[in-house]
């Protein structure tokens, strides 16, 4: 929550204290100012690395596979460094005094306004458009296991109305591999941290192509004043409704892409929130 507040504050000490809901003291203001200054430097570095990644992997320029690997390593290093500002913020010693979430619980009327129209025909929530969104494939590079690349497409759900990014791990020398669309847990941002347990490496070595979509409000889809996954909980009960209704449509796009790019079977799975989405 303190990290999300720093994102929203944009370097402003006053905005930071307003975000966390605590009164400022002169001593604490000085410490917060120094941390926010470093926070913005790391944010800028991460944005620059991410912009370079976007241009290299999804742009039209000629980039060697070695350069792509270096650009991806730089992106991940900078994002991990930016995410790690959480530990710096903890040194303020105020984490126990603030709410773990920025609550925005909707009223019954607000939820009803959005969902009452679907009560008679709930299937409409899960109906895909006649024309599925175009899926863009990035350039590829050799990862720790298999060939790695990303897919991007506009979410077909009006509940999120943003761009979905999914990382693909494709096994080597396997014609028409089976595909597993694998969802991550809540608050898990597998594509933005170093040192996480790789849940799919063994599957790729066994010849399975794994697609890992970023869930709504996680990773590249995180709102500017939130941390990854916060909105799912903080806006309950609407958050879970919106998430699952959107994710089902997004996974359907990935199922279609999988079937068009391989004759192998397609399976759904995941951990925690990802497992619930698969069900």
Predicted region positions:
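N-terminal targeting or regulatory segments adjacent to alpha/beta-hydrolase or S9 domains
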Residues: 1-150
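Short, surface-exposed "cap/lid" segments of acyl-processing enzymes
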Residues: 157-224
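Gly/Ala-rich beta-loop-alpha elbow adjacent to hydrolase catalytic centers
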Residues: 269-278
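Glycine-rich, often proline-containing surface loops adjacent to acidic residues and nearby aromatics
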Residues: 147-150, 176-182, 272
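Residue in the alpha/beta-hydrolase core beta-strand immediately N-terminal to the catalytic nucleophile
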Residues: 265-267
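Short beta-strand segments that buttress and anchor functional surface loops
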Residues: 149-157
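Alpha/beta-hydrolase active-site loop
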Residues: 224-261
